[in-house]
Amino acid sequence: MDLHSCRVWITGASSGIGAALVDALVKEGARVAMTARRADTLEEIAARHRASGAEVLVVPADVADRAAVHGAARAVEAAWGGVDLALFNAGFGRRLQVTNFNAEDFAEIFRVNVFGVMYGIEAVLPRMLERRAGHVAAVASLAGYRGAPTLAGYGSSKAALIHALDSLRFDLEPHGIGVTVITPGYVRTPMTAQHTYWMPALMDVDKAAAVIVRGLRRGRKEIHFPARFSWTLKVLRLLPFPLYERLVRAAVKRGAR
């Protein structure tokens, strides 16, 4: 994918991987429309890039609000005539404890991590289908590969997202629309800064953004990283559950030391 002058719409753009992706995409010469709830932060990012001559657009919205997401997409299309790459990055995690189990925690996570992406795809798809061109990408997580302690909500939302994108790829590619699923491991962001447990293969956010942009440029259908850690987890997906369970419990004990 040629990212120079590419019309990119990215959600979750105010911090973490999203903000780093804005920087990386601008360096590629892309035109970047940024969506997040914090309009003031988006304006600060936009001012910095506009000062260097980049073309950036601020379209604040809460991705859990379907009407707001559609409104943001219409604003980008009105400004630039369309979206070439829709990059859905917004998401959040919460570790759930069975001693305080609440199904609403699942609903809140899914509203952002799954439906927030589906609202965005729903919003941009008609124009992409008309043009028979475009690309959809979303940031899932290696946590979506298999179950892990306290990740019932976050992990299942990312598993749902991976499955949805892998399925949509079959449906959209005949219409000229590409689909990429992005599955990062641990990345140093404001979200992971709150974690107190062991995070193997923790990656710098700018390096993560560079890996994602390189993968998009090369037209990858899946972008997973860090390489050694992600390939290890891919192999673990193939293990019988009793063996997988023993390995996970051992890793948890190691991280608790």
Protein language model features and the residues they cover:
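Residue(s) in the substrate-gating loop at a strand-loop-helix junction
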Residues: 141
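Conserved glycine-rich cofactor-binding loop
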Residues: 14-15
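Substrate-binding pocket helix/loop in short-chain dehydrogenase/reductase
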Residues: 97-98, 102-107
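C-terminal helical subdomain
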Residues: 181, 197-232
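Conserved glycine-rich Rossmann-like NAD(P)H-binding loop of the short-chain dehydrogenase/reductase
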Residues: 30-45
